Amino acid sequence: MSKAREIRTKIASIKNTQKITRAMELVAASKMRKAQDRMAMSRPYASKIRKVISHVAASHAEYPHPYLQQRENIKRVGYIIVTTDRGLCGGLNVNLFRTAIADMKKWQADNIGMDLCVIGRKGEAFFRRYGGNVLAVADHLGDAPEVQDIIGIVKVMLDQYDKQQIDAIYIATNEFVNTMVQKPLVRQLLPLKTDEEEVEGGYWDYIYEPDESKDLLEMLLVRYIESQVYQAVIENIACEQSARMVAMKNATENAGQLIDELRLIYNKARQAGITQEIAEIVAGAAAVE
């Protein structure tokens, strides 16, 4: 019967764990919906500001802004890596690291150096071990970060670009496809390619003064980069909560299956114990007779 008591203890322990994973699943589902709402609200801003940049740049083509010009000799590139602060979100970070490293190896093959700015504690820990040149880290952003929280890390990378210490900037993040699918990707932030189709397809009857258009374009480009990084951060949060919800759901279901298996083992052990006791009683009665 001692074995049966051990099994009962295991069942009770797993039930407690199951309650925790179920609660975490519900919390993650709630946070995911909020993150999706923030993600949807920020997209129109980034889309509109890119259109404005395309028109302003086209109206003042004689002023080639450095953020819009492809550099011929690329000697060093920068990466902004967007990860999570916490774990328990499946293979979200691991898949992103694998994608980012695969992209970085293309530059390494050409002996091109790399600088990193990392968002999230998981990314910081990984690239400290991996050996990347981490310039800046932003962590503890929470579940509802503001644009101000990422301005510092963006400025570090833009300063490097302005000083020509790096010749291109890329961002590695997770794209939210749906609740079950999160896609790791790497895309180029700078130099920015203007939307030529948007310029040709629409006509804005605006007159830009040369000096003012330069200042406007400078401000818009910086704001656009900030908005892209912020969009990546909140989209990564939606991916994190979605992956955590799925992981906790699977953990809850696995706990239920394990409890069922242990109950079956417990019932068999209890039945064997009762059978043994009956056999001992019968044997004792027979000995008395």
Curated annotation (Swiss-Prot):
Q: What are the entry keywords?
A: ATP synthesis, Cell inner membrane, Cell membrane, CF(1), Hydrogen ion transport, Ion transport, Membrane, Transport
Name the source's superkingdom. Answer: Bacteria
Task: Specify whether Ion transport is a keyword of the entry.
Answer: yes
Gene Ontology MF: a single term: proton-transporting ATP synthase activity, rotational mechanism
Spell out the NCBIfam families in the cross-references: ATPsyn_F1gamma (TIGR01146), PRK05621.1-1 (NF004144)
Record's protein name: ATP synthase gamma chain
Subunit-level organization: F-type ATPases have 2 components, CF(1) - the catalytic core - and CF(0) - the membrane proton channel. CF(1) has five subunits: alpha(3), beta(3), gamma(1), delta(1), epsilon(1). CF(0) has three main subunits: a, b and c.
Family from the record: Belongs to the ATPase gamma chain family.
Q: What S-S linkages are listed for this chain?
A: none
Q: Where in the cell is it found?
A: Cell inner membrane
Coiled-coil ranges per UniProt: none
What PANTHER family does UniProt report for this protein, alphabetically?
ATP SYNTHASE GAMMA CHAIN, ATP SYNTHASE SUBUNIT GAMMA, MITOCHONDRIAL
Q: Which GO terms describe its biological process?
A: proton motive force-driven plasma membrane ATP synthesis
Q: How does it sit in the membrane?
A: Peripheral membrane protein
Q: What job does this protein perform?
A: Produces ATP from ADP in the presence of a proton gradient across the membrane. The gamma chain is believed to be important in regulating ATPase activity and the flow of protons through the CF(0) complex.
> Is the keyword Chaperone in the record?
no
Sorted alphabetically, the Gene Ontology cellular component annotations on this record are: plasma membrane; proton-transporting ATP synthase complex
Quote any Pfam family the record assigns. ATP-synt
